[in-house]
A protein has these predicted regions:
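C-terminal catalytic and target-recognition region of SAM-dependent MTase-like enzymes
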Residues: 233-292
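Conserved alpha-helix/loop element of class I SAM-dependent methyltransferases that forms part
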Residues: 104-122
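S-adenosyl-L-methionine
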Residues: 154-198
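Conserved SAM-binding motif I beta-strand of class I
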Residues: 147-152
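Conserved class I S-adenosyl-L-methionine
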Residues: 123-133
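Conserved SAM-binding loop of SAM-dependent methyltransferases across substrates and taxa
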Residues: 134-146
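Non-catalytic substrate-recognition/targeting regions of SAM-dependent transferases
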Residues: 10-24, 31-104, 111
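Mobile active-site "lid"/loop adjacent to the S-adenosyl-L-methionine
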Residues: 155-157, 177, 194-225
Length: 292
């Protein structure tokens, strides 16, 4: 099994993790927040964590909570990500759901997307980003010259993505507020084709009209539909964060839904902590039929 990690961050760093928490630096601000995967003990002492953390997330329910500041910091700030010719910006915010507007481990896929879109021997490759959140993958694809369609079921998240596009000095991403599965089925009926499809589906979710999404129930269906959307020259990136799935399950889903899969990368995504621990953050399958 392969291990994949983001190696080009300057504005982000995982400092330590353990005891169901993680300590992270986003720009100049250090956050302490829950991490269900961190089952081991912390490597740094509680005293060190308290000294380093600018703000801590306090869980108040199963899905929400509040931030307690140890130092006077802004509720909103920006960080940048650079990789070769790629230079993008993210607007971060302390949300009541413990998220800040970015999943830093996904930078490894931004690099892949940026490189792969540039290699496509197609004028303005068509790229579809599903469950797209605040749009890191959309920004990478757009910066590489792609014609990008960004789909998410939450309007506020789409607005956040648009701010990131503008902060990154990019333009003309197509925004779609819709349930991803419904959108894909409609695109299949229309006979649409895409050179690249990216999806990072949640374990659970609710669509624009209350549609319930459960990863294990719907992943095979959406991949079967997506297989009809890939153009002759194509790539696919599938990232999932669910304790119920494994790289072998992803491999079976890919091999049974897509024909003649080439250059398949398969494995676990992680972040390296400053303290020496590896934090697992989902599993990844990606492939392309583009010659190197």
């Amino acid at each position: 099994m392969n291990l994949f990690t983001a190696e080009n961050w300057k504005d982000y760093e995982l400092l330590d993790c353990g005891d169901l928490e993680k300590l992270e630096r986003f720009g100049n601000i250090v956050l302490r927040r829950p991490e269900p995967q961190a089952l081991w003990q912390k490597q740094y002492s509680e005293q060190e964590w308290n000294k380093l953390a600018d703000v801590k997330f306090i869980q108040k329910g199963s899905h929400a909570g509040e931030w307690k500041k140890n130092k006077p910091i802004a509720d909103k700030w920006k960080i940048g990500y650079n990789y070769g010719d790629l230079s993008i910006k993210f607007n971060l915010s302390l949300t009541s759901f413990k998220h800040v507007g970015i999943f830093p481990e996904q930078a490894l896929n931004w690099d892949f997307i940026f490189n792969t879109v540039k290699k496509l021997e197609v004028e303005q490759p068509r790229i579809l980003n599903l469950f797209a959140y605040t749009g890191g993958a959309s920004l990478a694809a757009k910066a590489a010259g792609g014609d990008v369609t960004h789909v998410d079921s939450i309007k506020q998240v789409i607005n956040w993505s648009r701010e990131n596009m503008e902060s990154s000095n990019l333009k003309d991403i197509r925004w779609v507020v819709e349930d991803a599965l419904k959108f894909v089925k409609r695109e299949v009926k229309r006979g649409k084709k895409y050179n690249g499809i990216i999806l990072d589906p949640p374990a659970y979710g609710i669509g624009t009209n209350g549609e319930r999404w459960k990863l294990e129930d719907s992943i095979n269906e959406i991949l079967a539909d997506i297989s009809n959307l890939l153009d002759e020259k194509h790539f696919l990136v599938l990232n999932v964060y669910s304790l119920g799935l494994s790289p072998l399950i992803l491999e079976n889903l890919i091999q049974t839904n897509f024909r003649n899969v080439e250059n398949l990368d398969l494995g676990e995504v992680y972040l390296n902590a400053q303290s020496g621990i590896k934090l697992p953050l989902g599993i990844l399958a990606r492939f392309n039929n583009i010659n190197p």
